[in-house]
């Protein structure tokens, strides 16, 4: 808190009430909240705006209703606006353990990617020149967290990858595109993080249009380009991802084939940067 004197001799309980209402309704934009992060609003947001199991350009994915978010943000105390305010006053140092920290920063990255789209609406891709002329939005300071501004690149590379070094994180961060992993309809939480990340990995890798495609008949395995993009986690590309991927391949023959890279050629699936928007559902 900023230590300013409260006029009128308010009872101690009144300060707590003011803090709660400030967090939820935008009254303490310059102060940092010293409390565990509550994902209730974010879960409501996901329930309202994320639709699972749709198809765009032949790719199955979870889509986002950006049209509705953009329209609703103009309402007073919209879910979207309240979430941004909640992040702005939250101090990440209050998170209690590694799992809570990872869950928080994954959720925050995904909110930031959505905000990138809404801030420049309407666009057909996060790499639209309307966002950045060089088609590189990752350096834009897009979110305020605890009174500090962050870019998507900072959250992904300087925090999630550099600090936690868990490659399963790649299956949870969503860059608002068709070929990226699906936006989970459930908020990530520290107490469930391991199971949530494993579920995300399995779902992504079972999607042959964007995750993994094994063709034993002609000796080719197609990997997602996320294993080529991130040189920090996968310096040798897909070759470095094989041991990570194998446990999530349910078919025994496919899994055994994957584990012997000398018998196949590594190729990469096309990466579709089109927006994962409900308005494009076929």
Task: Identify the residue ranges that each predicted region occupies.
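Interaction/scaffold regions that mediate signaling and macromolecular assembly across diverse proteins
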Residues: 35-95, 100-104, 113-282
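N-terminal secretory signal peptides that target proteins for export/translocation
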Residues: 1-9
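Sec/Tat signal peptide C-region and signal peptidase I cleavage site
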Residues: 28-34
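Bacterial N-terminal signal peptides
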Residues: 13-27
């Amino acid at each position: 808190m900023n230590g300013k004197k409260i006029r009128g001799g308010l009872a101690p309980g009144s300060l707590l009430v003011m803090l709660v209402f400030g967090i939820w309704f935008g009254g303490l934009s310059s102060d940092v909240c010293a409390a565990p992060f509550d994902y209730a609003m974010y879960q409501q947001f996901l329930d309202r705006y994320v639709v699972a199991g749709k198809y765009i350009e032949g790719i199955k994915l979870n889509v986002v209703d950006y049209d509705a978010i953009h329209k609703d943000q103009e309402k007073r105390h919209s879910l979207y606006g309240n979430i941004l305010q909640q992040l702005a006053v939250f101090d990440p140092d209050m998170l209690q353990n590694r799992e809570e920290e990872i869950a928080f920063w994954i959720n925050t990255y995904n909110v930031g990617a959505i905000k990138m789209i809404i801030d420049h609406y309407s666009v057909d891709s996060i790499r639209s020149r309307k966002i950045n002329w060089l088609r590189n939005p990752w350096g834009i300071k897009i979110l305020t967290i605890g009174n500090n501004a962050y870019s998507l690149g900072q959250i992904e590379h300087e925090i999630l990858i550099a600090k936690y070094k868990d490659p399963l994180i790649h299956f949870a961060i969503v860059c608002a595109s068709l070929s990226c992993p699906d936006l989970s309809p459930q908020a990530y939480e520290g107490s469930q993080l391991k199971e949530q990340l494993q579920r995300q990995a399995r779902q992504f890798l079972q999607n042959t249009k964007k995750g993994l495609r094994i063709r034993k008949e002609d000796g080719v395995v197609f990997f997602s380009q996320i294993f080529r993009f991130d040189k920090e986690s996968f310096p040798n590309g897909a070759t470095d991802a094989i041991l990570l991927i194998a446990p999530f391949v349910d078919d025994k023959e496919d899994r055994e084939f994957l584990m012997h890279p000398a018998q196949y050629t590594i190729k990469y699936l096309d990466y579709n940067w089109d927006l994962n928007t409900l308005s494009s559902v076929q």
